[in-house]
From Swiss-Prot:
It comes from the Eukaryota. It catalyses: ATP + H2O = ADP + phosphate + H(+). Xenopus contains at least three different sarcomeric alpha actin genes that are preferentially expressed in either heart or skeletal muscle. The cardiac versus skeletal expression patterns of actins are probably sequence-dependent; Xenopus cardiac actins contain a Glu at position 3 of the mature peptide, whereas skeletal actins contain an Asp at this position. It comes from Xenopus tropicalis (Western clawed frog). It is found in: Cytoplasm, Cytoskeleton. Its main location: cytoplasm. Its EC number is 3.6.4.-. One of its GO terms (cellular component) is cytoskeleton. Actins are highly conserved proteins that are involved in various types of cell motility. PANTHER family: ACTIN. This is Actin, alpha sarcomeric/skeletal.
Amino acid sequence: MCDDDETTALVCDNGSGLVKAGFAGDDAPRAVFPSIVGRPRHQGVMVGMGQKDSYVGDEAQSKRGILTLKYPIEHGIITNWDDMEKIWHHTFYNELRVAPEEHPTLLTEAPLNPKANREKMTQIMFETFNVPAMYVAIQAVLSLYASGRTTGIVLDSGDGVTHNVPIYEGYALPHAIQRLDLAGRDLTDYLMKILTERGYSFVTTAEREIVRDIKEKLAYVALDFENEMATAATSSSLEKSYELPDGQVITIGNERFRCPETLFQPSFIGMESAGIHETTYNSIMKCDIDIRKDLYANNVLSGGTTMYPGIADRMQKEITALAPSTMKIKIIAPPERKYSVWIGGSILASLSTFQQMWISKQEYDEAGPSIVHRKCF
């Protein structure tokens, strides 16, 4: 344990789907749990059962049958502050078991996070949790640090939102950031829909979690979608079976790659957007012509929705088709990319040069929440 060191910084990456939290300097987060707050659907009937009025994270997940589940972070942006406070409280006191007033805390935010949101995060940290110091960093920038680079373009795709963020010498270029409201949760919903067409019914929030598991275990990205569809139609080589919690076994075939294909063809779910290969290209084209070469050669994948087998090869193929023919294109898919935002935060918060970057409680008291715009960019 490193918390005997009084001042170890905490790193908390709040995603739409999962909270990743732990101590700076560690190589992986200590706590990873769903960003969910659940409230009982019915009045408790058992006397003395000690019914709580709300449950957070894994406990909410395990009692999902009797709860209504809410996600306080939608599309990467915090929308429900009361529930978010519950999640932070749970993170500090139940998961990490630390007193937040003793540790500087690094939080992450979505690219293009509204200014009012950064201020609100800052305010809650200092006023509710009394942290001695805090900092807010952009998720994609941290992922790039984790890959050992300061220049590149990050495709960060999690549960609620996908971003393309070009970064030059450590600074995100806001004018070229592309946001796509299509990510893991939408792919899970789409898989629920196409499994229903196969005759398997998944409807409740509890059943959605089962489908998410099917997606994580069996889905992959096809290098050539049409070819793969033809193969799936003529042979059973692509079929896999999955055992449901009640013991029933279901078989899935072309759904395995039709589900993540949505990332490249959002029209599958009725979205009029460009696919992730095109948004990457568009983002690069919005950057200065002199840095494009560096971006093409440093395409870093980050987040859980980039974990599909085959996604890097497919990106390589698609971007090569869009880019100038002589351009060197490299897709970097680090094996730990599911947690690379957190890892980047852990690296950043433990750098000696970073120590003067923290916003201290004193600075906050003097300047108020708007200090965050001056210190964190």
